[in-house]
Amino acid sequence: MALPGTLRFGVLMALPGALASGADPEDGVGSSVVTIVLLLLLLLLLVTALALAWRRLSHASGGYYHPARLGAALWGHTCRLLWASPAGRWLRARTELESPEESGPPEDEEDAEDFVIDGGPEEAAAKEEEQRCQAEQTRDPRDTDSDGGLGLSSQGPVGSGSSAEALLSDLHAFSGSAAWDDSAGGAGGQGLRVTAL
């Protein structure tokens, strides 16, 4: 069943070349227009396939890969990197010196704006949970070994900055453990092997 699909794809890929090679020199303008139209149709087909694949992935993951969520995460990461940079610290210090009496809108107004902008109670609750998790992580970053862990901490080497922290926080989605048995029913089996990811 895969052969007809592969055959169709091969014909589709070879069609612009075959049309361009069989043309007369006087007919060069017409064949280039046909080639461009075919390439644009191929591009449209690829974009449509990408959109359908993304929609299926988003539906299967419960919206985890939605562009709004990914964009918000990327924007938050960019803002954290900006504020951690020397230019961001300088900008923050400068704005604090210029207007210390203006503290901005009260928190209740900010929460109401976030609730309206974010689109509802589900997303607001998710953002609150995310902020609470970040606050717990930043509250006691040096005490990671007290939980009985493997001695791995989210702090990188001295001077590594926020890029190492961002890398380790991105790896959180891949954490877990696995167990398997390599023995094929033989008497010399060693039992289950366990690894932590």
From Swiss-Prot:
Task: Provide a GO CC annotation, any one.
Answer: plasma membrane
Q: How is it modified after translation?
A: Phosphorylated on tyrosine residues.
Which top-rank group of organisms is this from? Eukaryota
> Where Phosphoserine occurs along the chain?
S99, S103
Q: Which InterPro entries match?
A: PTPRCAP
Indicate, by first and last residue, each region the UniProt record lists as having compositional bias (Basic and acidic residues): 124-145
As annotated in Swiss-Prot or TrEMBL, what is the tissue specificity of this protein?
Leukocyte-specific. Expressed in B- and T-cell lines, in spleen, thymus, and bone marrow of adult mice, and in embryos.
Question: Where in the cell does this protein reside?
Answer: Membrane
Which keywords does UniProt give here?
Membrane, Phosphoprotein, Transmembrane, Transmembrane helix
Q: Does the keyword Transmembrane helix apply?
A: yes
Q: Which Cys-Cys disulphide bridges does the record give?
A: none
Q: Where are the transmembrane segments?
A: 33-53
Extract the ranges annotated as region (Disordered): 120-164, 177-197
Q: How does it sit in the membrane?
A: Single-pass membrane protein
Question: Which Pfam families does this UniProt record tie to the protein?
Answer: PTPRCAP
Quaternary state and partners of this protein?
A: Interacts with CD45/PTPRC.
Name of this chain's protein: Protein tyrosine phosphatase receptor type C-associated protein
Q: What is the lineage of its organism?
A: Eukaryota, Metazoa, Chordata, Craniata, Vertebrata
